[in-house]
Amino acid sequence: MTLPDVASGRFTQEKGFHIVLQVPETHVQIVIDAILDVAVLKQGDYDSVAFKTNTGLQQFRSLGTGRNPKSPGLINVPCLEVSFFLENEPAMITQVIEAIYDAHPYEEPVIRIQEALRTKHIPSVDEDNPNRIWNARDADWYKPDG
């Protein structure tokens, strides 16, 4: 896939990979912590940047050809999807996937890796924008120090 070249006076672009994985609800933070042990997940002036969905149901049936016995029917497990961006550094991507395999409770975790393009703001371009957190009333989720 060829990614477009996009940029403006407000943002630049960075090519890398979008990683999406499904994790049982009980193991989400364990897996995220394992990822953060090997990758900072940086986005501009922020680190530990990841997205977690609400709980959904992952379904599967074991064929009995792996470590687990054959399932008599479908199994449904409450799971979340976790997604994040990784820079185009093959060694780092390998370390992150290995960390997921080490921390994930499944024999075969569902992991999707897709070439991606992300934008990064150019600092000081719109400091006076009234929609920025620092220029508006505090959002209930944003509490600056001090």
What are these regions (language model features)?
Residues 1-146:
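Hydrophobic structural segments
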